[in-house]
């Protein structure tokens, strides 16, 4: 399995989910002064913000990270976290990033995810990267 790049707020839900995957990962910094530069293809894992609105659904640090053309060129897919209380906007950050970056929306999960979500993502990522290397 290849690299996971993720953003997690201070609540740490996305961080805990990625830790449970047990894969190589890099975290997008919370602060604007910190910058992450990737050098290899990755799948992005991001929470959804906005409380049910599409406005502000993608966290600002993720936007800053993807506004770097070198980072954006290496994204291969997106996984989103969210809160089902957001209704139709549940995990909508994944839809937005998928459309803007032209990459597949691979999976979505609620809050910090279940053991089933972790297994689904781990297995799905292995299959995804195998297909990527065969293409």
From Swiss-Prot:
GO biological process annotation, one example: protein modification process
Source organism, top-level taxon: Bacteria
GO MF terms held by the record: FMN binding
HAMAP family from the UniProt entry: NrdI
Purpose: Probably involved in ribonucleotide reductase function.
Protein family according to the UniProt entry: Belongs to the NrdI family.
Protein name as it appears in the record: Protein NrdI
Originating species: Brucella canis (strain ATCC 23365 / NCTC 10854 / RM-666)
Gene: nrdI
